[in-house]
Amino acid sequence: FTDTESITASTMVVTPLRGAATHDLVLDGGHDLFIEKVLIDGQQANERYQMGQGQLTIKNISKQSTVTIVNRIVPVNNTSLSGIYMSRGAFMSQCEAQGFRNITYWPDRPDVMSRFTVTIHADKTLYPVLLSNGNLVAEGDEADNRHWVRWEDPFKKPCYLFALVAGQFVAREDKIKTKSGREVLLQVWTEEKNYPNSEHALESLKKAIAWDEERWGLELDLDRFMIVATDDFNFGAMENKGLNIFNSRYVMASPSIATDTDYQNIESIVGHEYFHNWTGDRITLRDWFQLTLKEGLTVFREQEFTADMQPDESSRPVARIHAVPAR
């Protein structure tokens, strides 16, 4: 990353289907992608790819091959806010439903699932915090006051669950032990001014993780789980695997002015996005027609969580009644 543009290098290992009518690789591409080069097994492939309307076709991938596409994007000009965009000095992403194609050329469908390893390079002063999905596996410094980090998500996911955040944020964090005894790190990243208002979001995340273990036997499957709450996120809330992103208005609570309803709403919203870790992320969609399945099931789990967080059993029906007009 620089403050004006980003160079994206995506490398994918592609295996053709046996008996397929064609061995052409057709990738989706959005607006304002500027190709620098295309490589197949490390060799330039200028004669083997064609540009079409919203597509890049690479001809005759007849055996397992490593395809690398290097392209430029300009997040500061991305006013659609789909893909990676820049707002007030921070980079962030929104890829549901078809935003990943605005980052690089890719088979942008929910039934295409891949394991992602993401390396981010940026200026250390402007972008001290570099986040993506999964577990942090390596980091280091570079020349010219730059640094890099590498994130690895061990689980296959569709590209709409990819996330990236780079900017100046501070973290409220804690460590917990899962039911199986693993220690995991929980972090809520915010702009510095919002740090005092982030405590309830972290406590809500802890409650959601514990409840999912006890009620459904579903344990957090990563070494860390992160929430980013920023004033500049455009989507309200998004369940990216291991890196949930929220607009801060939905998860920040000032102890001096927040009401009981505010606290309950934050608990429900944080719970909802965390519960997608299994119902939506690990178990995902075949196509976008199934959106109602992952959202409906997760809303049900959220409502059960909210009811179970009530002070006594008699309050469960009240929580159910309140949930009806909300949905």
Where are the regions a protein language model picked out?
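Acidic/His-enriched low-complexity segments
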Residues: F1-R224, R249
